[in-house]
């Protein structure tokens, strides 16, 4: 099983980190663990992420490409290597929805933030938007981390 993670960085908004496994034989994804916390230092987040890296032997961490300073700090100061996530929002949401709709994602019941984010994720109702986009709320951070992981892992492993 390959183990990988998604990371959405925030400060006032929470930093969200989700750990997933992919079973190549069954072609199923497993959400194994999560971390969500706000108003913490980079060092505090790094400590939790390192703990999860050691616990799960994570192969890849896909991070929001807008978080380049955090990406550099993690690599330089905490030996946490990350890869920029694919961020095509609508394609990524469609990809995750396909996985969920086809019963290919199993979520550990202890991952309460992830369960909640999938239940509460919604589109922004603003009729003045030029295109659809997800509503920014407390559910969106873990959902973004999950999207970064699932969309980037799938596309990076099937592109060869």
Functional labels for PLM-detected ranges:
Residues 18, 24-137, 156-160:
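Mg2+-dependent endonuclease catalytic cores in nucleic-acid-processing enzymes, primarily RNase H-like
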Residues 15-21, 147:
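Short beta-strand scaffold segments in enzyme catalytic cores
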Residues 11-14, 26:
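Coil-to-beta-strand transition motifs
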Residues 149-157:
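Short, hydrophobic alpha-helical segments
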Residues 15, 59, 143:
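Residue-level detector of short, conserved catalytic/binding motifs and their immediate flanks
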Residues 8-10, 35, 66, 146:
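Anionic group-transfer/hydrolysis microenvironments
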Residues 1-9:
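ATPase catalytic-site recognition across NTP-hydrolyzing enzymes
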Residues 141-147:
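Basic, amphipathic alpha-helical segments enriched in Lys/Arg and hydrophobic/aromatic residues
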């Amino acid at each position: 099983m390959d183990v990988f993670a998604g990371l959405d960085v925030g400060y006032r908004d929470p930093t969200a980190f989700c750990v997933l496994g992919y079973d190549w034989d069954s072609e199923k994804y497993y959400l194994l663990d999560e971390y969500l916390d706000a108003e913490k230092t980079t060092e505090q987040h790094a400590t939790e992420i390192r703990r999860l890296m050691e616990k799960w032997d994570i192969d890849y961490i896909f991070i929001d490409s807008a978080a380049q300073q955090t990406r550099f700090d993690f690599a330089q100061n905490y030996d946490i290597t990350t890869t920029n996530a694919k961020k095509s929002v609508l394609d990524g949401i469609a990809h995750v929805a396909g996985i969920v709709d086809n019963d290919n994602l199993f979520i550990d019941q202890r991952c309460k933030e992830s369960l909640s984010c999938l239940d509460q994720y919604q589109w922004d109702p603003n009729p003045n938007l030029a295109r659809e986009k997800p509503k920014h709320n407390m559910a969106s951070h873990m959902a973004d981390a999950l999207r970064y992981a699932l969309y980037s892992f799938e596309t990076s492993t099937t592109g060869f």
